[in-house]
Amino acid sequence: MLVSAKEMLDKALAGKYAVGQFNINNLEWTKSILLTAQEMHAPVILGVSEGAGKYMTGFETVAAMVKAMDKSLGITVPVALHLDHGTYEGCYKCIKAGFTSIMFDGSHYPIDENIKKTTELVNVAHNLGLSIEAEVGSIGGEEDGVIGMGECADPNECKAIADLGVDMLAAGIGNIHGKYPANWPGLSFETLAAVKEKIGDMPLVLHGGTGIPADMIQKAISLGVSKINVNTECQLSFADATRKYVEAGKDLEGKGFDPRKLLAPGCEAIKETVREKIDLFGSAGKA
């Protein structure tokens, strides 16, 4: 059964570990992540960007697939289905489709408008028992055409948004989506500590979890990060394993071209990446 992300993240904050949000793009991604979370007895959040939702023919298709797969696979660990970087309109579409958690990314609005829209969505989400994430300070890199420079959030703006009653807050601390450049200066723990001081006991979210060194991840968790988003790393490992399969000519052996065989190495690679992250985040055995 799908659940809101609130309880799992409150537990993570109290227990000083983080829950992984792994973005899904299709059936193979979803199945691989669910099976790995179950195997490791870890709570998990399935993230869906608006672009991925559109690719999978809409949020209703996504919700139906995830709910059916959760049941068919006999998954017993807590699973939240979460809209990632949602627009105002996208949030309402996901609420209607049956998602259990939403993220409203109002970081590109002036702070007053961000507050107004966030307040409205907090009330709607909480009335329906859903969790809601908000963002302050854009996350760098590109996510489905949304480009941010990786700025650091203003701790006072973070407090203003946190006070609206959101369940988790994504604060920009120099993190970016996608591959990190060689000259990346690292996470701003100074900003993270200042934000934490302002918002108190609220789970913080780290976007762009791919490529951040393990010691930085662990320090971020110790400072109150309770949800870490991973997407690019699963895509890279899937692509790498699939490329090796084809380059080795295995698609030409017998029925190696069957998509169930062709995609299997990529699925195993996703599972391995998810395993590594669950171990790093400390959420194994926490379901």
What is the predicted function of each stretch?
Residues E247-D258:
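Active-site gating loops and adjacent loop-to-helix segments of metal-dependent hydrolytic enzymes
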Residues V3-G15, L27-A52, T57-T76, H85-M202, ...:
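Alpha/beta enzyme core
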Residues V19-N23, L81-H82, M103, L204-H207, ...:
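Short catalytic-loop micro-motif centered on adjacent basic/acidic residues
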Residues V246, L263-T273:
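Family-specific functional microsites
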Residues Q21, P213, P259:
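Metal-dependent phosphohydrolase cores
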Residues N23, I228, T232, R260-C267:
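Hydrophobic alpha-helical scaffolding
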Residues I173, G208-T210, T232:
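Active-site proximal loops enriched in glycine and acidic residues that flank catalytic Cys/His/Asp
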